[in-house]
Amino acid sequence: MYDAVVFDNDGVLVGRTSFDTLREAAWDAFVSLGVDDPDLIHVDDVAVGVNPATLTDICERYEMDPAEFWRVRDETASAAQIAAARKGQKTPYDDIDTLRHLDASLGIVSSNQQATVDAILDHFGLAGQFEVAYGREPSIASLSRKKPSPYYLERVLEDLDAETAIFVGDNESDVRAADNAGIDSAFIRRPHRRHIELSCQPTYEIADLHDLVSICGRAPVDPDESI
C-alpha cells in the first residue's frame, strides 16, 4: 500500500530517555562552559523542547555563545543517551521484529541528535533495517527543522523516492509533520501514550508495530532471517 514506512525513533522503536537523564546532561553542559550553578528552570528549558529564541535568551543571561552552548548540550545529551542504551536503560520495544515483515522501504525521522540515532541503531543491530535515518545536526538551525516541520521527513521521502508513505509516531508533532508533508500517519499508543487525547487526527491509531502489517502489507521473509 505504501512505498515507504517512516518511523519516529524514541517512544516508537526504542524506549524514551528519562527526563532525569536529559536534565543531568543539560546541567553538565552548563558546568562544562563555566556555569557552575545554573537556574534549574533554565536547565529544564534546554533539556527538552527548547526553541531558538528561548535558547538565545538563556545563553545571554549567562554570557555564553548560543551556538557553542548548543553544540555542547547536544554532545552531552547524546553521550548520556548512548550510555543509557549500553546500560540496558534504553532498549528496543518487544515488537521490533515486526519491521522485517513490512512490505515497504523503511526510514527514520527523529528530533534527537543524528549521533544518538546512529549509535543506538548500531548498538542494537538495527541499522541494516533502514535505508535512511535522519536525526538533528548539532546546530541551532536544526531546532526550527524539528517536527512538526516536514523538513527531515521530506528529505527521507526524497531519498527513498517514495510517492506514497506513512509516518509512525507517538507525538502530535509526528502527526502534524506527516500532514505538512502530505502523507499518512499512524499514532502508536505505547503505554506512555495510552490515555492521551489528540487534538489532531492521524490516519490510523495503532496499539503496537504489529498493527502495521495489515496496514502496509506483509513482505516475504526468510524464516532463518532475524534482526
What spans do the regions from the language model cover?
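Asp-based, Mg2+/Mn2+-dependent phosphohydrolase catalytic module
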Residues: 2, 114, 120-227
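N-terminal helical cap/lid subdomain that shapes the substrate entry/recognition surface
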Residues: 2-100
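Generic recognition of short, well-ordered alpha-helical segments
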Residues: 17-21, 119, 180
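Internal, well-ordered alpha-helical segments in soluble enzyme and binding-protein domains
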Residues: 55, 95, 116-117, 152
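Surface-exposed amphipathic alpha-helices with a cationic face
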Residues: 96-103, 175-179
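Conserved phosphate-coupling serine/threonine residues in phosphotransfer and NTP-handling enzymes
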Residues: 110-112
